[in-house]
Curated annotation (Swiss-Prot):
It catalyses: tRNA(Leu) + L-leucine + ATP = L-leucyl-tRNA(Leu) + AMP + diphosphate. It is found in: Cytoplasm. GO terms for biological process: leucyl-tRNA aminoacylation. InterPro entries: aa-tRNA-synth_I_CS (IPR001412), aa-tRNA-synth_Ia (IPR002300), Leu-tRNA-ligase (IPR002302), Leu_tRNA-synth_edit (IPR025709), M/V/L/I-tRNA-synth_anticd-bd (IPR013155), Methionyl/Leucyl_tRNA_Synth (IPR015413), Rossmann-like_a/b/a_fold (IPR014729), tRNAsynth_Ia_anticodon-bd (IPR009080). Belongs to the class-I aminoacyl-tRNA synthetase family. This is Leucine--tRNA ligase. GO terms for molecular function: aminoacyl-tRNA deacylase activity; ATP binding; leucine-tRNA ligase activity. Gene3D superfamilies: 3.10.20.590, HUPs (3.40.50.620), Isoleucyl-tRNA Synthetase, Domain 1 (1.10.730.10), Valyl/Leucyl/Isoleucyl-tRNA synthetase, editing domain (3.90.740.10). It comes from Coxiella burnetii (strain Dugway 5J108-111). A motif ('KMSKS' region) lies at residues 576-580. ATP binds at K579. Keywords: Aminoacyl-tRNA synthetase, ATP-binding, Cytoplasm, Ligase, Nucleotide-binding, Protein biosynthesis. The gene is leuS.
Length: 820
């Protein structure tokens, strides 16, 4: 053992030991309790950033802690390798995305290994490998057979110059990020997964997720968006057709003064054929982004269609307007407008001089100026004929029943959640296994022809779809009639890959089936770690896919992740680290200067996992100083500890002196609190406990046999508490100080109940309920001794002067109250 702390050397030695001994490669073992710890897999950008390091350090602390607790721990790592960023990088560098991606993976794998994470690298997966996406294509075929994968028209952001679909973040001021062309809303045929079939179960099973952050549960609940409402039929004034409207406020039905339909509604398209003004308006609407948030905040605009609908109750004529704020994807693309009781409808009505008809007044009867603002709260019905004077809640049921009895509507449970559009008009993604034949129509690729391989030698240009221009890919033969046919050139949303990867880690070597029984052993994931930004999309899709895999008989649980931790961001100067802000700190430079253990220790100590972490150079220096202090202490006590560790009776040592028992009590109290905090994932306070223990031990001397044994016990506790956080130095010191074997094979320390037993208690002394002092008494002191000690306390005597004691109340082991 060197006198000076040399992190580069000891970290290299520890990592070589783990690799040579396959320390973290695990097998299924039904005789042991399993623990599956997983951090969200990274996109291989080429460089680890501090956000990665924090995420994976937290996960590694949890995994190593569970190893110490004797569990069979799986902690794998892989790469979310498909997607737009790789394609964009390839366009800029004029090289195939496959080449760019695999080079980045190689670099990032090396960086992860430098940090000493306890990953089972034998299970590594890369989502752009055909051995992985083959099973994704197989899964798509199963969904297609069950009617859960289907194709329909949907609205997208279309770049007319690059001839491609754009994500919302690729649009800058209404123009394509590359071409600068004005982006259009275009309707194209796309593939969807029927997640809405699972809406009710996805909502209900949120109640099972007792160890998820409440914020995430709320976000998912709102995204699924269950509401109870009514479908109302509005017949068109002319002809047999009708418009169906979904509303959660049937109590406002008598206040409808117009209907609004989406620009993509068939009725709007039909009217555009007969009106140049309407056609021009629809064209203008196409230049709006498809994101719901953008549509909600844009200026409300519309045009009169010239058509009328008939109110189902009053039989009044209602004008039908085409409005840019109505979403075709929500309900039926028709809104019943009640401007007196809806802010958006109110704004639109004032702009286009449409009538307002108040039908609800405040329940307390105070006046409301409906021209100034919509009254949106429940209240009492007015101007509603036979429904007058009833409250909104009652009116919901009364009007819903009336509509049903008169064939004009029906109750409906509605979900905000829409089916998952998985088509991407991109190259770098999983090919959708579908063939189009002029004779046979849409034909799924036979399972024995999987995988449909993505050509990896393409250099995308950013113009159009590369797969449509690659004849060797899209030209094929129909598997049914053997005539010439074409392949689907859309690829799958990368959220599909990340919706089931956690299960594939259980059996990445399986080439006969998607998942085998090992998946049932390892899933669900016991602890999942990732950012709050994935609260809805990724986590919801993974929950959906887990239920699909369960229904296919491949898994036997309802939910993918038992416990979820959403770690905070890493900030510098109050802002998230980013290249554009110039506030990035690279992990590699810190590892080179201080070592991986210092980086890990700072990350863990600087903030609780769920809170944002403010970067501090002095904090990193402080972590490094602590590890040097630990090393120096260990070097000083090494010879004494080696000697003590060779004694046969070292584990049964009895401390007689009160000062030694008190010191031991302090150490075990720190351990007790650290264990509580480990279970609560409050690792920063575990580090605080370790620092306290080291400060206690440093004051002891190895010249005294009792203290040498105390140092041995305390150091053994300290190193095991640190082992998940700073594994390299803990591994090295454990062996160098003669504790024997691999520290990871040793059980997690538990406080000794005898050490925690105290010989004295501190009691609060009150006079008439007010704190007047504290006393120390033996733990087994009688009521009489407690009373006597309290009454003789100097401050108590001062407050008792000239007062008569009525009674003395002793609350055992807590307080004594003197009533005067």
């Amino acid at each position: 053992m060197n006198e000076s702390y040399q992190p580069t050397l000891i970290e290299q030695l520890a990592q070589e030991y783990w690799e040579e001994n396959e320390t973290f490669e695990v097998k299924e073992d039904l005789s042991r309790e399993k623990f599956y710890c997983l951090s969200m897999l990274p996109y291989p950008s080429g460089d680890l950033h501090m956000g990665h390091v924090r995420n994976y350090t937290i996960g590694d602390v949890i995994a190593r802690y569970q190893i110490h607790k004797g569990r069979n721990v799986l902690q794998p790592m892989g790469w979310d390798a498909f997607g737009l960023p790789a394609e964009n990088a390839a366009i800029q560098r004029e090289l195939p995305p496959a080449e760019w991606t695999r080079k980045n993976i190689k670099k990032m794998r090396k960086q992860l290994k430098q940090l000493g994470f306890a990953y089972d690298w034998s299970r590594e997966i890369t989502t752009c490998d055909s051995t992985y996406y083959r099973w994704e294509q197989w899964l798509f075929l199963q969904l297609y057979k069950k009617g859960l994968a289907y194709k329909k028209n949907a609205i997208v952001n279309w770049d007319p110059v690059d001839q491609t679909v754009l994500a919302n973040e690729q649009i800058v001021d209404g123009r394509g990020w590359r071409s600068g062309a004005v982006v259009e809303r275009r309707e194209i045929s796309q593939w969807f997964l029927k997640i809405t079939d699972y809406s009710e179960e996805l909502l209900k099973d949120l109640d099972e997720l007792k160890e998820w952050p409440e914020q995430v549960i709320t976000m998912q609940r709102n995204w699924i968006g269950q509401s109870q409402g009514v479908i109302i039929n509005f017949n068109l004034e002319k002809g047999p057709d009708k418009l169906q409207v979904y509303t959660t406020r049937p109590d406002t039905l008598m206040g409808v003064t117009y209907l609004a339909i989406a620009p993509e509604h068939p009725l709007a398209k039909e009217r555009a054929k007969k009106s140049k003004k309407i056609a021009a308006f629809l064209k203008k609407c196409k230049q709006t982004r498809v994101a719901e948030a953008d549509i909600a905040t844009q200026e409300k605009e519309g045009i009169d269609s010239g058509l009328f609908a008939v109110h189902p109750l009053s039989k009044e004529k209602l004008p039908i307007w085409i409005a840019n704020f109505v979403l075709m994807e929500y309900a039926s693309g028709v809104v019943m407008a009640v401007p007196a009781h809806d802010e958006r409808d109110h704004e639109f009505a004032l702009k286009y001089d449409l009538p307002l008809k108040p039908v609800i007044e405040p329940a307390d009867g105070h006046d409301w100026d409906y021209n100034q603002a919509a009254y949106t709260n429940p209240g009492k019905l007015i101007n509603s004929g036979s429904f007058n004077d009833i409250d909104s809640k009652t009116a919901f049921n009364v009007i819903a029943d009336y509509l049903k009895n008169n064939g004009a509507g029906s109750r409906q449970t509605h979900y905000r959640l829409r089916d998952w559009g998985i088509s991407r008009q991109r190259y770098w993604g999983t090919p959708i296994p579908i063939i189009y034949c002029k004779t046979c129509g849409t034909v799924p690729v036979p399972e024995n022809q999987l995988p449909v391989l993505l050509p990896e030698d393409i250099i995308p240009t950013g113009h159009g779809s590369p797969l449509k221009e690659t004849a060797s890919f899209y030209k094929t033969r129909c598997p049914v009639c053997n005539k010439p046919a074409t392949r689907e050139t859309d690829t799958m949303d990368t959220f599909v890959e990340s919706s089931w990867y956690y299960a594939r880690y259980s059996c990445p070597d399986q080439d006969k089936v998607m998942l085998d029984d090992r998946a049932k052993y390892w899933t669900p994931v016991d602890q999942y770690i990732g950012g709050i930004e994935h609260a809805v999309m990724h986590l919801l899709y993974a929950r959906f896919m887990h239920k699909i895999l369960r229904d296919l008989g491949l898994l036997n649980s309802n939910e993918p992740f038992i416990r979820l931790l959403t770690q905070g961001m890493v900030l510098k100067d109050g802002a998230k680290m980013s290249k554009s802000k110039g506030n990035v700190v690279t992990p590699q430079s810190l590892i080179k200067k201080y070592g991986a253990d210092t980086v890990r220790l700072f990350i863990i100590f600087a903030a609780p996992p769920e809170q944002d972490l403010e970067w501090s150079d002095s904090g990193v220096e402080g972590a490094y100083r602590f590890l040097k202090k630990l090393w120096g202490f260990s070097y000083r006590i090494k010879d004494a500890l080696l000697a003590v560790n060779q004694q046969k009776e070292r584990s049964n040592y009895q401390w007689e002196a009160p000062e030694h028992r008190q010191t031991r009590q302090q150490i075990h109290e720190c351990l007790q609190q650290a264990n509580i905090d480990m279970e609560r994932l409050q690792f920063n306070t575990v580090v605080s406990a370790v620092m306290k223990i080291l400060n206690i031990l440093i004051k002891l001397t190895t010249d005294n046999d009792a203290e040498a044994h105390l140092i041995r016990e305390g150091t053994g506790i300290l190193l095991r508490l640190l082992s998940p956080i700073t594994p390299h130095i803990s591994h090295h010191l454990w062996q160098s100080l003669g504790f024997g074997g691999d520290i990871l094979d040793t059980p997690w320390p538990r406080p000794d109940p005898k050490a925690l037993q105290t010989t004295e208690l501190e009691l609060i002394v009150q006079i008439n309920g007010k704190l007047r002092g504290r006393i120390q008494v033996p733990t087994e002191a009688s009521k009489e001794i407690i009373e006597s000690t309290a009454l003789n306390q100097e401050n108590v005597q001062r407050h008792l002067a000239d007062k008569k004691i009525k009674k003395v109340i002793v609350v055992p082991k807590k307080l004594i109250n003197i009533v005067v």
